[in-house]
Amino acid sequence: MKKNILLYLIVFVIVATLAVGCGQPVEEPEEPSENGESEEDVVKFAIIFGVGGLGDNGYNDEVNRGVKMAAEEFGAEYDYAEPQDISEFETQLRMFADAGEYDTIIAVSTEQAEALKMVAEEYPEQRFTMIDTKIDDMDNVHSISASHPEQHFLSGVLAGLATQDDRFPLSNPENILGFAIAMDTPTSRGQASGFLAGAKYANPDVEILTNYIGGYNDPVTAKELALVMYERGADIVSVNAGSSSQGVFAAAKEKNRYVIGTSLAMVDPEVSLSTSVKKVWLFIVQEIESLDKGTWEPGFTEKGMAEGVTDYDVEGLDVEIPEDVIAKIDEAREKVASGELVLPTDLDQVDAWAAENQME
């Protein structure tokens, strides 16, 4: 008897379930989102940050600012990876490409260029975006970069004017500056060449010390190199080296001398002279916007002072820049933006360039 009751109950549940299923209304199409797309059309991208990862108070965090802005503005979805070593780039690029679910895969920093080119060739139907390195010969890659020399040129002009000037309390009479270079790559050399050109444009007799740190995640070595430059007489040291830059800031604090960084998130109001600004977050926002609007194209895009992407900034710093110094920097900016001054792109070009270009 119990078996019969159980059988009746099972049959009843099955029939009831079928009845409910057959009685459901036809599913309505999804409502479009605020940007005019259905949820299925929302841009989805993957991004691989540079070595050092998030929390570096520098380059990666600036990129991540753009990621968050793009997600908020366009409702974009994303996945990300934080490699701890250069050897991981290819594996992570391949992992995202294998998934086949991203509108683009974004690689951050020049160290990823070779891995990206290799993987992009193997996945011709997958779009890739390269940040800060020129790749213009692949049909599925769009590369975006700021002018590396232009990012550092105006801070170089400021440094050339500030050294030996007693209106800047942490300067000294030695007429020596320093630049801590992340790695021996075209990008890093281009950055350094901009600073050196700016300093020599404003101050032809200045001596500029340079050292290679060897990586973007080595603040200990960076501090040691910066201390050497300060001890040799430099009163201002500039750096663009991801989380390694933290070591240069520590050295500046210890020696009570000036430092110039590249992120508004990494400043020390007491010893920072300026920040060499590159609005890298705009690259991410503009890239996702092009996917959202269907205007994405492969090739190479470079932006600088003329587009408002590169500049110097003293926001949040204790330093007071005299009006006559600001006027000279403004004049230099106008000449670069207009094309009157075309900057050198590598260190071996600086001396010849400076011999022909001097501030009036």
Residues covered by each model-derived region:
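Bacterial N-terminal signal peptides that target proteins for export
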Residues: 1-9
